[in-house]
Amino acid sequence: MERYESLFIRLKERHEGAFVPFVTLGDPGIEQSLKIIDTLIEAGADALELGIPFSDPLADGPTIQNATLRAFAAGVTPAQCFEMLALIRQKHPTIPIGLLMYANLVFNKGVDEFYAQCEKVGVDSVLVADVPVEESAPFRQAALRHNVAPIFICPPNADDDLLRQIASYGRGYTYLLSRAGVTGAENRAALPLNHLVTKLKEYNAAPPLQGFGISAPDQVKAAIDAGAAGAISGSAIVKIIEQHINEPEKMLAALKAFVQPMKAATRS
């Protein structure tokens, strides 16, 4: 959890925002997935947002659903994902690692056991995509018991009451949604969300990172100009994996070429 705080302090001193890529663990296979994550970090990723393959991903558009299918095809299990997380943490001791998941995966293990395992392998945050704030008590309580930041999604139409709850219960960062709907780079992020950012700050929420539809450096810059602490990009990155599925080296080069200008756009 503290890794996020340290990161945001460091970035503020350097007048930078955070660039956070999302990928599905085990896509397209364990070995290449670990290389992908190393490449993202080497190219400038400030934190990681990682998915555990799940059979019914509600918030995911087709690009990320396909990533899940590729990981399943490679036989990747949640247990192997935790082994991968331990390896990533060992190799990259300071980078914040967040999981983006669904409640069933948490329930499968037992809520407390799931967060205990997150703590053990060095996961900093967990966003449970299909659990709304008002139903989050058992998740966030278990998270805090195990020093894992509970992350909440702030939708573009959030009312004052929801903003207060997100500010009160969330830790690490706040996932600021560019727009409603499913993830996907083909739906570009909409208007700057200045009013939400202002309110979240007023209520002392964890720093907002804008996600959904972030696929170009100008959008990263716009998110930061609107007051966000950074931007999360998922589908655009997963698409690169898909496009180079049979060319592992080209894939890594293309990922590097995508991340570098996205990170550069966070520097004022």
UniProtKB/Swiss-Prot annotation:
InterPro entries assigned to the protein according to its UniProt record, in alphabetical order: Aldolase_TIM, RibuloseP-bd_barrel, Trp_synthase_alpha_AS, Trp_synthase_suA
The keyword Lyase belongs to this UniProt entry's keyword annotation: yes
Involved pathway(s): Amino-acid biosynthesis; L-tryptophan biosynthesis; L-tryptophan from chorismate: step 5/5
Catalytic residues (UniProt): 49, 60
MF-aspect GO terms: tryptophan synthase activity
GO cellular component, one term: cytosol
Gene3D superfamilies noted in UniProt: Aldolase class I (3.20.20.70)
UniProt entry tagged with the keyword Amino-acid biosynthesis: yes
One Pfam assignment: Trp_syntA
Keyword terms, alphabetized: Amino-acid biosynthesis, Aromatic amino acid biosynthesis, Lyase, Tryptophan biosynthesis
EC code(s) of this entry: 4.2.1.20
Catalytic reaction equation(s): (1S,2R)-1-C-(indol-3-yl)glycerol 3-phosphate + L-serine = D-glyceraldehyde 3-phosphate + L-tryptophan + H2O
Family: Belongs to the TrpA family.
Chain's role: The alpha subunit is responsible for the aldol cleavage of indoleglycerol phosphate to indole and glyceraldehyde 3-phosphate.
Subunit structure: Tetramer of two alpha and two beta chains.
The protein's name in its UniProt record: Tryptophan synthase alpha chain
